[in-house]
Amino acid sequence: RMHYLDENPSSKDVVLLLHGEPSWCYLYRKIIPHLVEAGKRVIAPDLIGFGKSDKYKDKDAYTYANHIDWTSQLFDHLQLDNIILFAQDWGGLIGLRILTAQPDKFSGLIVSNSGLPVGIGATEGFNQWLNYSQTVEDFNCGKIVYQGSMKKLDEAEIAAYNAPFPDETYKAGARAFPLLVPITDGHDQVKENIEAWEVLKTFTKPTLAIFGEYDMSFRDQDKYIIEKI
């Protein structure tokens, strides 16, 4: 089961908010009211393994292809149209694949610290994150979000980011995500991501790239997105 928020469902103008690692739709708690006030319908799911969605205990249950399939099922179930996609971090790796499968359903795109890797390596920052995610004994999701935030979170906010992960058995999805990024040419989704880039090059709807300048994992990816889309 995939949990999602559906605010202002009567509106025909949809904003789809896809979160990344290791957060959940709580990430968008301050954005959603403003979008609703502007007359938008807001859909904000929790990816499988995160938030209030189901969580597999077996890390091997999580694959890039499975995440695309799980989120696509929700997308098809809701029968959304006229969508602006806001895709942050892993929300982009998943959301951009959904957009390129059905581009006519989207009216705009905002990419934030994300992209579609095609197996040509990773930044040193990402490699450090990958190593950390697999070796640290206490994978404290609230602390990770806190350390990556320019706005310092209070204790209640940190606790909210930790709430979906009461112990290590709930964190298989969060531990798995860094392993699933296509940073080598042997990854089984490289071909599909290359094909998705070809679709993105033809996407003519309004597109915006918003990247944090201190993000070491997606350094300079905003320039690539601006150039290609």
List PLM regions with ranges.
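Conserved catalytic-core motifs of eukaryotic protein kinase domains, centered on the activation segment
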Residues: 27-29, 53-60, 120-123, 220-221
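Conserved loop-alpha-helix segment in the C-terminal half of the alpha/beta-hydrolase fold
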Residues: 204-229
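Helix-rich cap/lid subdomain of alpha/beta-hydrolase
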Residues: 118-177, 181, 188
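Active-site nucleophile elbow and catalytic-triad environment of alpha/beta-hydrolase enzymes
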Residues: 180-199
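Conserved hydrolase catalytic core segment
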Residues: 80-121
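Conserved HGGG/HGGXW glycine-rich cap/lid loop of the alpha/beta-hydrolase fold
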Residues: 7-52, 225
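Active-site loop/oxyanion-hole signature of alpha/beta-hydrolase fold enzymes
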Residues: 5, 37, 44-87
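A short loop-to-beta-strand scaffold at the N-terminal edge of the catalytic core in hydrolase folds
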Residues: 1-7
